[in-house]
């Protein structure tokens, strides 16, 4: 079965690194996780059609050109909550400076249709004493 492709794109390493770690902790090798931190590379990467299941991008990187891509779930990390240039687009908005756990949980809960059963978190072995 093909792994879902998740692209995290933000020039702010302080946001993208903990989010990347969270995805790796929960889903290990069940997803194809790609990280983009450079604006020029982001534009070049999406200049041709890509097979991406979930895109999480900073609002500075997001443009209406991304609607031409076949991306089932798009999330825009915004600094403020409220209407802005992405409010009329197909992307879900997430406040960038909320907790990483909150950002991650929102992405996962709104993307369950994309990942189906392959999106179950990695279960670590636990020892229980009675």
Question: Where are the language model's segments positioned?
Answer:
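Short acidic, S/G/P-rich loop/turn micro-motifs used as interaction or catalytic elements
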Residues: 12-16, 41, 60-64, 81-83
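A short, hydrophobic beta-strand element within the central beta-sheet of small alpha/beta folds
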Residues: 54-57, 67-84
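Conserved acidic segment of CheY-like receiver
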Residues: 3-14, 19-23, 54-56
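Walker A (P-loop) phosphate-binding motif
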Residues: 119-130
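A short, well-structured beta->alpha microelement
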Residues: 24-66
């Amino acid at each position: 079965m093909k792994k879902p492709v998740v692209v995290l794109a933000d020039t702010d390493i302080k946001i993208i690194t903990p989010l990347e770690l969270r995805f790796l902790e929960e889903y290990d090798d069940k997803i194809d996780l790609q990280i983009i931190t450079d604006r020029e590379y982001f534009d070049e990467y999406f200049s041709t059609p890509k097979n991406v299941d979930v895109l999480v991008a900073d609002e500075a990187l997001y443009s209406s050109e991304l609607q031409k891509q076949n991306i089932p779930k798009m999330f825009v990390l915004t600094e403020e909550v409220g209407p802005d240039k992405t409010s009329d687009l197909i992307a879900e908005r997430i406040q960038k400076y909320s907790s990483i756990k909150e950002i991650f949980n929102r992405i996962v809960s709104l993307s369950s249709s994309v990942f189906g059963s392959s999106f179950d978190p990695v279960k670590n072995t636990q020892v229980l004493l009675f």
